[in-house]
C-alpha cells in the first residue's frame, strides 16, 4: 500500500510541474514570433525583415588635409560579439527535473530573516549557473 501512495505522490508532483511549466510559457509568450501587427495593417504589406549595417567607425579626415604617408587612419575596434555573451552560451544539459553539473559553494551566514529568492531551480538560471542558496536567499551562482 505504501508504494502505491508513493506513486500517486510522484504522479501529482509531475502533473504540477507540467502545469507550472505551461503557465510560465504563457506568461513569457511564444518564442520567435516578434511583435503583433498594428491594427488595420495587413501582414502582407509589411516592410519585411530589418537589415542592420555595421558602419565603418574609423576617423574622418579633416577637410583639406591628406593622411600622413605610411600611416593608416585610426580604426575603431568593434566588439568580438554583437550579442549578449550569456544568451550566446549553448544550453546546458540538466533541465526541468535534473540538476546541472557542479556543486554549490558553502554558505557561512545570512543575517536576513526572510532572504529573497531569485530562482527556484537550475533551469531558471542561464548558461552554466546553478540555482544555489547564496549568501542571502537563493540565486544563480557559478558552481565549483
Swiss-Prot record:
Tissues and organs where the protein is expressed, per its UniProt entry: Large intestine (relatively low levels).
Signal peptide: 1-21
Region 8 X 6 AA approximate tandem repeats, annotated ranges: 34
Signal keyword on record: yes
GO cellular component, one term: extracellular space
Positions of Sequence repeats: 34-39, 40-45, 46-51, 58-63, 64-69, 70-75, 76-81, 82-87
SS bond partners: 104-132, 110-136, 119-131, 125-140
Protein keywords: Disulfide bond, Repeat, Signal
Keyword match Secreted: no
One BP annotation, GO: innate immune response
Domain WAP: 97-144
SMART domains according to UniProt: WAP
InterPro entries on file: Elafin-like_sf, Trappin_transglut-bd_rpt, WAP_dom
MF GO annotations: serine-type endopeptidase inhibitor activity
Superkingdom classification of source: Eukaryota
Protein name (Swiss-Prot/TrEMBL): Protein WAP-3
Source organism per UniProt: Sus scrofa (Pig)
